[in-house]
Structure formats: C-alpha cells, structure tokens
Amino acid sequence: DLQNVDQVFIPIFSAEDGFLLDYAQKLIYNNDSKIVVLDCNDQIKNNFIIKNAVDSLENNYPSNMSLLTNKVIEKEFLNQHDLMIISLESWKKLVDSQSDWLSDIPSVLIVKP
C-alpha cells in the first residue's frame, strides 16, 4: 500500500530511461523525496547527458539525491523504499528476466516516454 513517496528509487537500465530523471527532480522539488538512482549496466557512467542530469541533481539537492551502482539488489534495500519509478520498456525487460527481486519491489509507477 502506497502511503508516502518519501523514499523513491529509479533504476536506469538504458539510455532511453534518462527521462525518468525529470520525475526525480519533480519529486524532490514538490515533495522533498529522497531519490536513489540505480545505475544498471553502467548506463549513467557511459551516457554524457544522463550523467550530467544526475550530477546536476546531486549538486542542487545533495541531501535528496544519491547514485547507486550495485549490481545486486537486496531485499533490505527494496524494503526501505516507498516507490519504484521505471520506464515501460525497462519494466518489460525486468519481467522477462524474471529477476529475483521482483517479488520484493515496493509500489511501482511504470512510465512511457
């Protein structure tokens, strides 16, 4: 049950997921949410535009924004969050991969660009 959107994580699976950072900015600005961006497959490190957007958010909102590069997602990490925001294409890939952590994810907002 989604009660709050205080703790949100956003996995970035591909370069096309960069638009999700707009949602991160809005949640920080309007709700003072704490955002964790998960860099899957080194997408942020290898994409100049996404990296700049993440760096800008980290500089402007250092207490609200963090970047995580772990490849393994633990149940404890998922339990700390209220919401996951993911693109439709990445959601499809995640479901197709039958990832172990799917059963433990919090509420999900699936967004199409």
Predicted regions and their residues:
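Intrinsically disordered or low-complexity boundary/linker segments at protein termini
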Residues: 1-49, 58-83, 88-113
